[in-house]
Each structure stands twice: as structure tokens, then as C-alpha cells.
Amino acid sequence: MGADLLIKNAKIVTEQGVISGSLAVKNGKIAAVASGDLLTEALEVRDIGGKYLFPGAIDTHPHFFDPGAEWREDFWHGTCAAASGGFTTVLDMPNTLPPVKDGKTFALKLRRAMAGSLVDYALWGSAMPDNITDLEELQRLGCIAFKGFTLDAGPDFQWSDEYEQLREMKKISELNGIFGVHAEHAVLVQRFTELYADEEWSLQVHDKSRPPEAELTAVNTL
């Protein structure tokens, strides 16, 4: 066959289970998997000493905050971390500054991803009350899915009440698209946040301000 890369002595993780054997790569794709040794020549041969060999993982929910808040994390540092953990594809969320809400903001973020990403990537788009007419363009440009919020997500990312959620769902359904929702009931979160406002902030207090009932109510409404 002749391969570009032959990986030997591997524990190969497959849908059917773990195979102790070898894997050949040709033109950037898996060409063959076999138990034991593959009898093929290769430009490069690696014996990985019985280590596990996984397919590249996909992170569907990173927040790289690039552009707008790169001090938190940008595409370069975020995808370096992804690659070190075995993630070869990232699907980045649209909560950037500005959010990905139309063709202009999509193009801006795409340039940042092209310049900084170490791994394969795709981009989510936003679904907000003021950009429903832009969803079709976003999909055409390459947005893989749309993200909406059922509660306040900051001044730059509009959240949607039940009426707006219905409008967004109908439009995305017409596009045969995918709609992902940050589902927490706005009133419950607001009231519980007010209830614990006088307590010193901690992870435990933050958790109490967003009880399971807030998520369950939002999901049931959706």
C-alpha cells in the first residue's frame, strides 16, 4: 500500500472497542487499521509502546473570547490547549465582542480564527431578537449552528423571551439549522440572585443563585 505514517504497537480505540495493533495514514487520512503489525512500507514509522491511540476529539462548546477579550483566552492559546488534550476540532461559541450576529462580525471572527487556530475549527452564530433576518446569511457563510439565551447575557448579547425564542426557532427550522440555547429561567435567576445578594460571593453562593429549577423551567418552556 505504501503509507505516509505507520503507527505500531498501539492500543487503538474504535467504535467496536480497543484493538492492539497498527494504524496507517495516507494523505492525512486513516488508510488501514489492523491487529498486530501492518505489513506495509511507510515514510515514517512510530512505535508508541502500547499507548492508547484515539481519534481526534471535537470540543463543541469552547469560549475563546477572540476578538474582544483576548486577555481571557484567544484562538492561539485556546487551541494549543485543545491540541495538547487531544482535541483536533473546536466549534467556538459566538459570545465575543462584538458577538457573531451578521456577515460583518462573522468575517471578523473568521479572520481571527484563520490567523490563530492551531487545530480545525468552525464557528457558531448568535440568535437574537435583532438579527433574525441575518441568520440565513450567517448560515450561508458557514455558521454551523446558532446560540440563544433565555436570560441576560450581558449588554452585547441580547437575550430572548418566549415570543422571541419562538421566532428564532421558526426561522432556524426553515433553514434546517441547529439551535442551541443557554436555558435558565430569567425571572428565577434574577430573584434568587437578589435573595443571596448580601452574602459574600463564592462559588457556592453563585450555585445557589441558579438552582436546578431555573434550568428545568427554561427547558420545559422551550
Please provide the spans of the model-predicted regions:
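Divalent metal-coordination and catalytic microenvironments
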Residues: 10, 23, 28, 50, ...
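Active-site mouth loops of central-metabolism enzymes
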Residues: 60-73, 96, 120-131, 157, ...
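Histidine/acidic residue-rich metal-binding segments in metalloenzymes
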Residues: 133-222
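Alpha-helix-loop-beta-strand connector modules within alpha/beta enzyme cores
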Residues: 103-119, 166-181
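Active-site loop-to-helix "anion-binding N-cap" substructures in soluble metabolic enzymes
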Residues: 94-118, 124-129, 137, 150-155, ...
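Histidine-rich, glycine-flanked metal-binding segment
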Residues: 1-6, 11-55
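Metal-associated gating/positioning segment near the N- to mid-region
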Residues: 51-116
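Hydrophobic faces of well-ordered beta-strands that scaffold small-molecule active sites
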Residues: 56-62, 90-92, 121-125, 146-148, ...
